[in-house]
């Protein structure tokens, strides 16, 4: 019988320790760091290995300022060193759950790619935070993706204005206890 491999401490530590950073230093991302973040997203698993995503990287300050208008809580995009828009085939048009573009599969896969990028950034000393897109027409106009594509989330990245933000303790309340959220075999 095969014994499960223990989770390496650095992986679990990163999962448990990553924090949202909304206040960024006025400093561009090192191109190698940006490439590693993008590679982390590229290496995410996906349903049927379709990799149904395109990443649009924005580094221009003017563009980032305009992107900050795509949602009521997207203001952090204006101060980011870079943003990565996560673009997929429009999941609202993918209604057949047996098809290659099943809406839940597309969004699940996108979440996997996003989390890989967030964890890679954290490991590099780079903060991040997601922005939900509410103004879809504005996002399409600014980013230029075709009508059959959709952007629901944009990730902000930057070196934190306060490096302690990457390692600060969780806010009071933290995570729910495992016993509150896990059921075995049945509810």
Segments from the language model and where they lie:
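C-terminal helix-cap and adjacent tail motif
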Residues: 2-14, 20-21, 153-187
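Short secondary-structure boundary segments
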Residues: 88, 133, 159
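Short, flexible turn/loop "capping" segments at secondary-structure junctions
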Residues: 14-18, 46-49
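Residue-level "edge-of-site" marker
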Residues: 54, 134, 153
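Glycine/small-residue-rich phosphate/adenosyl-binding loop
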Residues: 33-39, 43-110
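Small-aliphatic-rich amphipathic alpha-helix that forms the alpha element of a beta-alpha
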Residues: 41, 84, 99-142
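A short N-terminal beta-strand-loop micro-motif at the entrance of redox/enzyme domains
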Residues: 20-36
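A glycine-rich helix N-cap at a beta->alpha junction
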Residues: 75-85, 144-167
């Amino acid at each position: 019988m095969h014994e499960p491999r223990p989770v390496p401490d650095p992986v679990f530590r990163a999962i448990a320790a990553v924090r949202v950073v909304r206040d960024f230093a006025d400093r561009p991302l090192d191109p190698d760091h940006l490439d590693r973040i993008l590679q982390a997203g590229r290496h995410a698993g996906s349903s049927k290995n379709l990799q149904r995503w395109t990443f649009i990287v924005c580094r221009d300050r003017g563009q980032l300022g305009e992107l900050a208008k795509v949602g009521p809580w997207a203001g952090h995009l204006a101060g980011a060193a870079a943003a990565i828009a996560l673009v997929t085939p429009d999941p609202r048009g993918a209604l057949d759950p047996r098809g290659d573009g099943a809406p839940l599969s597309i969004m699940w896969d996108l979440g996997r790619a996003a989390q890989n990028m967030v964890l890679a950034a954290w490991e590099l000393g780079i903060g991040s935070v997601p922005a939900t897109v509410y103004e879809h027409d504005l996002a399409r106009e600014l980013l230029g993706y075709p009508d059959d594509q959709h952007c629901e989330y944009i990730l902000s990245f930057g070196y934190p204005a306060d490096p302690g933000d990457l390692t600060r303790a969780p806010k009071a309340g933290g995570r729910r206890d495992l016993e509150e959220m896990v059921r075995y075999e049945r509810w």
